[in-house]
């Protein structure tokens, strides 16, 4: 078997891993993870695409997603869960794609990247939006219910393109 075929077969067996990152990992990134998991399930890609989320700070480590985000997501039949965690050096090697929710987190993720070579692509979530000119997914933490709805609208928009992006990576 040629080495190209071996690599191709390995790609078919290994899932494409996506990490969503915001500041505290209690609002935007766990919601992005939940939206993406729902979309992946609906597309029948459970075995090909895996998702997780993390924060750039450790302040909320161990906490569940914000109850307001959980409620807003639940109203759309999307289930949030898990516990907040901080991004770590292994994430840069284990994930194929790291998506940040805003410019500050993008800069933080880049600055936290290990000096050694890492395999993850680091991109901004909003680069995948098709129905909005937004350049950041706003942090709804200090606002009202409408902020959580806006975040979910953006996440649902972007996740459609992210699935296609991941599909293209899996096929290669």
Where are these regions (language model features)?
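Helix N-cap/beta->alpha junction signal
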Residues: 29, 102-103
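Conserved active-site segments centered on acidic
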Residues: 2-94, 164-172
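Phosphate-binding/catalytic loops
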Residues: 2-4, 15, 97, 103-172
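Hydrophobic beta-strand core positions in alpha/beta domains
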Residues: 20, 99-100
């Amino acid at each position: 078997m040629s080495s190209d075929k071996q690599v191709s077969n390995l790609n078919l067996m290994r899932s494409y891993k996506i990490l969503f990152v915001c500041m505290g990992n209690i609002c935007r990134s766990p919601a992005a993870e939940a939206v993406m998991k729902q979309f992946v399930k609906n597309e029948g890609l459970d075995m090909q695409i895996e998702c997780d989320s993390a924060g750039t700070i450790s302040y909320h480590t161990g906490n569940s997603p914000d109850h307001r985000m959980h409620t807003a997501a639940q109203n759309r039949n999307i289930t949030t869960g898990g516990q907040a965690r901080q991004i770590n050096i292994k994430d840069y090697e284990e994930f194929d794609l790291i998506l940040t929710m805003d410019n500050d987190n993008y800069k933080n993720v880049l600055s936290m990247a290990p000096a050694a070579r890492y395999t993850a692509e680091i991109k901004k979530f909003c680069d995948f939006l098709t129905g909005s000119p937004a350049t950041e997914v706003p942090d709804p933490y200090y606002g009202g219910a409408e902020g959580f709805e806006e975040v979910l609208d953006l996440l649902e928009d972007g996740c459609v393109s992210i699935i296609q992006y991941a599909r293209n990576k899996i096929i290669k």
